[in-house]
Amino acid sequence: MALMNFLKPKNKLEEGGRCSVPVMQDEGEPEQKCPNCHREIPLSRLMADNMVCGCGYHFRMRAGQRIKLIADEGSFVEMYKDVRADNPLGFPGYDEKLDAVRAASSQTEAVICGTVRIGGCHCCIFVMDAYFMMGSMGSAVGEKLTRLFEYAAWKHLAVVGFTVSGGARMQEGLLSLMQMARVSAAVKRHSDAGLLYITVLTDPTTGGVTASFAMDGDIILAEPGAIVGFAGARVIEQTTKKALPDGFQKAEFVLEHGFVDAIAARNKQKKLLTELLKMHE
């Protein structure tokens, strides 16, 4: 079968739910349906509430919006914006997909890196974006993160990272998979310098990102209801031939089993991060 004729299977991480496209109502106000309480929420209200429904459901958030929520006003300085993926394997359709995603998102890659002040604390930050190829990790993402941790180690700064990912970017093959070890090695050097690394796991944090730097943090937080895991629940059920428990891979389930340190609602994250950063100063 020709590669170009390959039919991509439906990806549950990419359709519906937390980042589905808002529906335009007759009066012209876009609305988003909450998968939890099933209410139709005006998009303007949802944006004003930092993409959190009144029932507590956390929708996915764009990287730029998250930085505005967490950063002290005017403090964020972006780094490595010129680092972007190309098509090292000549994968059919990859160039066109990158061009389309960049045009739609106004971003160059699936992660934004830089320096910032959070509650007055100077640190480095990276924020992954589900709206850029589901935050998939390719060679450019790995390069940006590696550079960020090396810079943080040089400047003796803590790193705060917000993860969201469907895993390694298949269009880059082994080059994407090797970023797991590459970034984790940079995290280790940063840790060996006695510096703090805090991760905030958002929905979904899966695949190679979970198996590497997402779970390397000294302190690991997670947003309510976020999916955190390696393989998908359906794959696990089909492989083990066993039914999975309720809430499997949800942040609360992961917390109960000791893989994260705390659940942090979006409106409380800046205060908590400030307290943790100040404890380390």
What would you call each of these model-derived segments?
Residues S105-A110, G135-E150:
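Glycine-rich anion/phosphate-binding loops
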Residues L98, V127-S136:
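Short, basic, glycine/proline-bearing loop/turn elements
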Residues S165-E281:
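Conserved catalytic cores of soluble enzyme domains
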Residues P35-H38, A130-Y131, G166:
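Short hinge/gating elements
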Residues V116-M128, K144-A168:
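A structural preference for short, pocket-lining loop segments at secondary-structure junctions
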Residues M1-Q107, T115-I118, L276-E281:
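Intrinsically disordered, low-complexity segments enriched in small/flexible residues
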Residues M133-M137, R169-E172:
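A generic structural signal for short coil/turn motifs at secondary-structure boundaries
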